């Protein structure tokens, strides 16, 4: 069998500093292939690897990167003490500016946000780029973690009807943040919401997932389920972006 050439591979890096990176790797592996959406469809194999340093990222040269859940402050500390001399977060800021896709889940969504409510004293290093207000540990402590079904309206391009509705998607919230507000309402698209019933019986709608250009954020953990549809969505976005760059 003829070996796949570079153009027939889509490479996904999963930041493996701390948290649930192995689950993300396994979920991406379960997808196996994706296809271009042009008239003559091309089949793309998916390569996924853990990345722990800037040198790892440069070596893999991924088309997209996933930031896992975990403890955002711990990840920021590990990133700042990276032993190859380059801060991963600084590198990822430039990676995003170059138009590459990135997806943060739970703690990863905090790291991608420009504004964090409830940030620890002295703050923490953030990657930023996502123009929202996010609240750390909005859903409470570990014992307040829960699972529920939500609907997601997954957008592929801005001002375009091309979207996929995922109904009854299993969402796992573990000491989860919540997106309280969208600052840049023109460019940030809401793809998931949830109605929270507070202890006093009142209800509040919070945002659970958003897309801003090449940045995706979800406050829940798709990687802890048996449903790889959100990962399929991200991989397809990465592929579409890659095809635009190489103009297939």
Swiss-Prot record:
Q: Name one GO molecular function term.
A: pyridoxal 5'-phosphate synthase (glutamine hydrolysing) activity
Catalytic activity reported: aldehydo-D-ribose 5-phosphate + D-glyceraldehyde 3-phosphate + L-glutamine = pyridoxal 5'-phosphate + L-glutamate + phosphate + 3 H2O + H(+); L-glutamine + H2O = L-glutamate + NH4(+)
Query: InterPro entries this protein is in?
Result: Class_I_gatase-like, PdxT/SNO, PdxT/SNO_CS
Q: Which residues form a coiled coil?
A: none
Metabolic or biological pathway, per its Swiss-Prot or TrEMBL entry: Cofactor biosynthesis; pyridoxal 5'-phosphate biosynthesis
Q: What is its EC number?
A: 4.3.3.6, 3.5.1.2
Q: Which residues form the active site?
A: 106, 221, 223
Q: Name one GO cellular component term.
A: phagocytic vesicle
* Family, similarity comment: Belongs to the glutaminase PdxT/SNO family.
Q: What does this protein do?
A: Catalyzes the hydrolysis of glutamine to glutamate and ammonia as part of the biosynthesis of pyridoxal 5'-phosphate. The resulting ammonia molecule is channeled to the active site of pdx1.
Name of the molecule in the record: Probable pyridoxal 5'-phosphate synthase subunit pdx2
